[in-house]
Amino acid sequence: MLKADPECGIAYWGIALSLLLNPHVPTPAKNLAEGAAAIAKGKSVGAKTQRERDYIDALAIIYVDHDKVGHLPRTQGYAKAMEQVAQRYPNDDEAQIHYALSLNASASAADKTYANQLKGAAILEPIFARQPQHPGVAHYLIHLYDYPPIAEKGLNAARIYAKIAPDAAHAQHMPSHIFTRVGYWQESIDSNKVAQRVAKEASDLHDQLHAMDYQVYAYLQLGQDGKAKTLLDEMPSVTGFTETFLVGPYALAVSPARYAIERGDWKAAASLEVRPSPLSQVQAITYFARALGAARSGNPEAAKVDIAKLVELRDKLQGKDAYWSEQVDIQQKVTSAWVLHAEGKYDDALSAMSAAADAEDKTEKHPVTPGVPTPARELYGVMLLDRGKPTEALVAFEATLKKEPNRLRAYVGAAKAAEKSGDAAKAKEYYGKVVAIAANADTTRTDVADARAHLSR
C-alpha cells in the first residue's frame, strides 16, 4: 500500500494495529515503539477522509505514554475512543467490529456480569448473521464468549471459524478456547493438532507453542499422559521466538507444571527447573509448582524458599500489571496454605486455602492459557477431603466443575467426597463421569481404575 501511496495515512494505521499483535496481551516494548512511530506518521501525512482520521486518532490512544502507562488503562482508553467512532459511523461494520473487540480486551477480570463481553457479542451477532464468512467476527465472538457462564454461546462461531481460514494457525486454534471452556477435550486436541501443524509450516512459533500448551492440558484431562509427555518433550525444540511476548514463554513454563500437578507427581513438581524469562508472571508459574510440590511432598521449608520468590515477583508486577500481580498473589496464598497444612496447622491451612479460592473465583483466567496451573477451589476440596470433611469438599469440587466442566481431577475428588459423605447416588454419577471422560486413559492413572472398580461393585 505504502509503495503505491507513501502518503496513505490509513496504511500507517494498519501497521500500528498489526504491531499490537494480540490486544489481550501486553505488546512487546519494541512493537510499541514502532507502532507509536507508525501512528505518528499516519497523523502527520494526513488521511483522505474524516472517517480515516477518526480511526487513526482512536488507535493513537493505545500508544500514548506506552512506556509509562500499563496495557489495560491504555486499552480502556482505546475502547472509549472506538465507542465514539462506532457511534459516529453506525453503518460501518468494521467500526462496530473493532469496538466490540476493544470491549473484550478492556474488560475487568473482576466483572462477573460480563457486561463488556455481552455488549460486544450483541454488536457482533447481527453482523455474523449477515456475514457468516467474516473471519474477524467469528474470531472475536469466540474471545467474547470465552468465559464459563457464557461459553456455550460461542460454539457456533467456534465450529465455523476454522472452516473460514484453514491456512491460518490462529484460526485453527481459536475454537479450542470454547471447547476448553465446555470441556470438549478431544475437540480441543483435534483443533490444536491442526493449529500446531499450520503454525510450524509458517514458522509461527508463538502459535505453535500455544497450540501445544492447549493440547497438553486436554490430554491430561483425558488421562492420556503419554501423549501429553510427547508434546512436552517436543516443546523446548521450538526456539527463536520473542521472549517478551507472553504466549510462547507462558506455554513453555506452564506445560511442565501442569504435567506434574495434574498427575499428582509432587516430587517432580518440586524439582522443576525455572526457565529464564524477562516476564515475572512466567517465572512465577514454575515457582508456584515447585512450592506446591514441596509442600505436598512434606518439605515446607523448601516450599518457603519458592514462596519468597513468588512474593518478589508479585511485588515486581505491582504497579505495572495489576492482573498478573493478583494472579501471582493468589499463587502465593495457595502455596502458603499448603505449607501450613504440611506443618500440621490444619485449621489455619483450611482458612488460608478458602481465602485463596475465594480470591481466585473473583478473577478470570487469561486468554493466553486454557486454565490456571491448577484451580484453587479444587485444591481447597482436596484439603477438605484430607481433613475428613467430605461434605464440604464435595461443594468445593462441584463449584470447580461448574466453572471448569469435565476437569478430571475435580470429578475424581467429587466422586471420593460423595462416597465418603454417604451420597451413593452422586458417587456413582461422578465415578461414571471419571470413567467416561478417561475411557482411553493410560493405565498409570490409578484414579480411573479405582472409579471402574467402584462402578463394578
Give each language-model segment a name:
Residues A4-D5, I15-T49, D57-P73, S106-A115, ...:
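Inter-helical turn/loop elements of alpha-helical hairpins
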Residues E7-L19, A47-K68, N91-A109, Q131-Y145, ...:
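Amphipathic alpha-helical repeat scaffolds of TPR domains
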